[in-house]
Amino acid sequence: MFSPIQAFSVLMMPSASEMQSAGFWLEKGNDLCNSGQGQEAIKAYDHALGIDGTLIDAWNNKGLVLASLERFPEALQCFEEALKLTPSHKQALSNKGMVLAQQKKYAEALGCFEAAIAADAYFAGAWYNMALALQCLGRGKEAMAAMKTAETLEGGRGSCCRR
């Protein structure tokens, strides 16, 4: 007879078909990332991409994990792969810009944020990130205007978060 824990673990075991699904490995990577297991998340995203190399969210999310580990060249490569598949992918554009900004490449970062905003003018996170890049470039008035737009898009909550 199974204990409740053994029974639960059997129910949670993925089927063979799930194990062959890129979507399964993407979700596994997301779960691992959300639980702070970055290295394991990267492995899961790699597995997903081995099954389906066109899975944009796996490229983007892997890039985010790599950026959080300060592995910036690898992160940029992931965002580039996502953008090869969908050049106007707003999250990949903004995330690429954030990595460039972390490397103090503010002019390049600004171009990414502008492209993300061109893809979705209501993307508050890109406006916020653009404001930071503009400020770093010494363009204070433009930075204030971008920040005001970000705050307006966030619904007047008074604070914006990177997205």
Can you say where each PLM-predicted feature lies in the sequence?
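Helix-start (N-cap) detector for alpha-helical repeat units in TPR-like alpha-solenoids
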Residues: 22-23, 56-57, 90-91, 124-125, ...
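Structural signature of tandem alpha-helical TPR/SEL1-like repeats
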Residues: 5, 34-47, 68-81, 88, ...
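Alpha-helical segment of the N-proximal tetratricopeptide repeat
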Residues: 18-51, 57, 68
